[in-house]
């Protein structure tokens, strides 16, 4: 998918940038288009996030779309199997795979040693930094300004790991969310002072 330009085409469609090419952390050894594995099943249930634009989100017709949706459909077509996609949200998608309800998951999941004990990962197709977002009139300019305030983050993400590691240093509280839509709504309503998410997601919001 990378060698023939399919991956870059999908990412550029949603971000305007060839991030997979620009980022050296994304390997070039992904399976070339047309080099098929032998699927064990003719159909797979794939679980995914529900609100993580531009990777996955509902469009104006309430259809899930985005980088992850385009990519998993392209993989299925290239490898000769069909898919049924569920979008229950990040936490529920993880549970779906663990319970066997879904055979796979496509989402913004950081590869960790702990997760490797439970999941088999593909090679990464996108890497991104985590950044903070605040309201336009916020006076928060640095982590030091977060003291005594509440920061929102999605459960089970690299952003949560970072915030947990540094909360005592900067004195903020953490509120976790199971989906991105609720987290962004909380920022807009003022129930959290800031949120942390992947950079392309915040820039797309």
List the model feature ranges, each with a label.
Residues 2-40, 158-178:
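Ligand-binding clefts/hinges and TM-proximal coupling segments of bilobed small-molecule sensing domains
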Residues 4, 13, 39-109, 174-176:
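Extracytoplasmic small-molecule ligand-binding "clamshell" domains
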Residues 50, 109-110, 136, 155, ...:
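Short secondary-structure boundary segments
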Residues 92, 108-118, 164-165, 188-205:
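A ligand-binding cleft/hinge motif common to bilobed small-molecule-binding domains
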Residues 119-131, 180:
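Short Pro/Gly-enriched coil loops immediately N-terminal to beta-strands
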Residues 134-151:
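Flexible hinge/capping segments at coil-to-helix
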């Amino acid at each position: 998918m990378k060698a023939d330009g399919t991956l870059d085409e999908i990412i550029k469609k949603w971000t305007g940038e060839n991030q997979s090419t620009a980022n050296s952390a994304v390997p070039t050894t992904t399976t070339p288009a047309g080099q098929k594995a032998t699927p064990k099943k003719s159909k797979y249930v794939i679980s995914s996030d529900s609100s993580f634009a531009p990777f996955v989100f509902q469009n104006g017709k309430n259809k899930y779309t985005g980088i992850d949706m385009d990519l998993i459909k392209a993989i299925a077509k290239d490898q000769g199997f069909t898919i049924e996609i569920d979008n229950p949200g990040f936490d529920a998608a993880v549970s779906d795979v663990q319970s066997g309800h879904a055979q796979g998951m496509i989402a913004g999941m950081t590869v960790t040693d702990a997760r490797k004990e439970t999941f088999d990962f593909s090679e990464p197709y996108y890497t991104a930094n985590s950044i903070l977002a605040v309201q336009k009139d916020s006076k928060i300019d640095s982590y030091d300004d977060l003291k005594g305030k509440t920061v929102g983050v999605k459960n089970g993400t690299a952003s949560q790991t970072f915030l947990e590691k540094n909360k005592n240093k900067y004195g903020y509280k953490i509120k976790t969310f199971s989906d991105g839509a609720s987290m962004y709504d909380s920022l807009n309503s003022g129930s959290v002072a800031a949120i942390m998410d992947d950079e392309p997601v915040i820039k797309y919001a």
